[in-house]
Amino acid sequence: MSVEVLNESGEVPSPCPEQELADLARHVLDQLRVHPRAELTVTLVDERTMSSLHERWMDLPGPTDVMSFPMDELRPGRGDADEDLAEGVLGDVVLCPSVARAQAARAGHAVGDELLLLTTHGILHLLGFDHAEPAEEREMFDLQRTLLLTFLAQRGRTTTAAPEAGRT
C-alpha cells in the first residue's frame, strides 16, 4: 500500500502525528482488502484551502472537516483467494485540522482521535460508501467504528471520538 500523508496546514496536530494517519490508512485498506499496490494521499490543509475546495466541489461556503476525491474506481475485496483486485490510485482524502480541532472540542475528545475518525470516514467515501440514506449511514458508520476501534486496539488504545462524527 502506498500511503502518503502531507501536512500543508501549517499546524502540527498533536497528538496525532502524520505517521499514525498513514498507519491507520494502511489498516483500513488492508482490512477492506484493497489491492496492496493501491495509492492513497491524505493531505492536511488550512481553512482557506478547505473553504476553496468545499465551495468549488460541493458548492458550499466555508471550510469542512474532510473531503474525498476518488481517482480510479477501486472497491473493497470480498476476501476470495482467487479474487482479481484492481490496482490503481484510490484518491485523496483532505483534512482540515482546525475544523477537526473545533469539532473535537465540542464533542469532548482529542483532536488526534477526530483526525483518525475523519481519515477513516474519507477513505470509506473513496471506496464508494455513503450516508445519504439511513441504511447506508448505518452500514458506513458501523464499519467506520469497527475499523477505527480495531486499529486502536492493536495499539493498546481506545478512542473518545463518537462514531457519528465526520458526517460530510
Regions of interest found by a model, annotated:
Residues 1-115, 124-168:
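An acidic/histidine-cluster motif and surrounding catalytic segment
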Residues 118:
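Residues within the DNA-recognition helix of helix-turn-helix
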